[in-house]
């Protein structure tokens, strides 16, 4: 992005661009189980998660490295988003962090297993596998558009009613 390059040209040049976006859904077959994958901040991108669910993911695996954000709420924010993704897609989510809290989250958003931040360990946890699509995944991007349209229509109706009342009001 040219705007960032103008702000810090010496730093922008240090960021490698030796990768490109894939063309397949972010779903991998792991011994017959289809797992949707997202790395770090990918979890915030609705289309990526929906594509994984639509691509047949039976669970999601989110990996992240929160080392740069120690002492902040970033890890808890990512866990909250992972929890929301479990509920939204109706799938189990395994959120694994190199230094932050790691959790196994059930499709209903409840925590099944967890490791605290900065605690070395491993979890071996049975997770529920699910197929099918939730209304959130099916409707996806339509919901914000419909809400925005509803807001515009509501404001237009309110504006028309207000102008009609003003026109009918007796003058003093």
Where are the regions a protein language model picked out?
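Enzyme catalytic cores with a strong preference for nitrogen-chemistry domains
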Residues: 1-172
């Amino acid at each position: 992005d040219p705007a960032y390059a103008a702000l810090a040209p010496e730093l922008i040049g240090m960021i490698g661009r030796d990768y490109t976006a894939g063309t397949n859904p972010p779903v991998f077959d792991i011994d017959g189980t289809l797992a949707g994958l997202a790395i770090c901040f990918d979890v915030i991108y609705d289309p990526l998660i929906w594509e994984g669910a639509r691509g047949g993911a039976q669970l999601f695996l989110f990996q992240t490295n929160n080392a740069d954000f120690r002492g902040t709420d970033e890890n808890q924010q990512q866990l909250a988003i992972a929890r929301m993704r479990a509920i939204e897609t109706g799938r189990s989510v395994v959120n694994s962090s190199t230094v932050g809290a790691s959790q196994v989250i059930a499709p209903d958003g409840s925590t099944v297993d967890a490791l605290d931040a900065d605690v070395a360990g491993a979890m071996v946890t049975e997770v529920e596998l699910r197929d099918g699509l939730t209304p959130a995944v099916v409707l996806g991007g339509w919901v914000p558009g419909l809400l925005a349209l509803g807001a515009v229509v509501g404001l237009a109706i309110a504006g028309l009613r207000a102008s009609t009342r003003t026109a009918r009001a007796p003058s003093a």
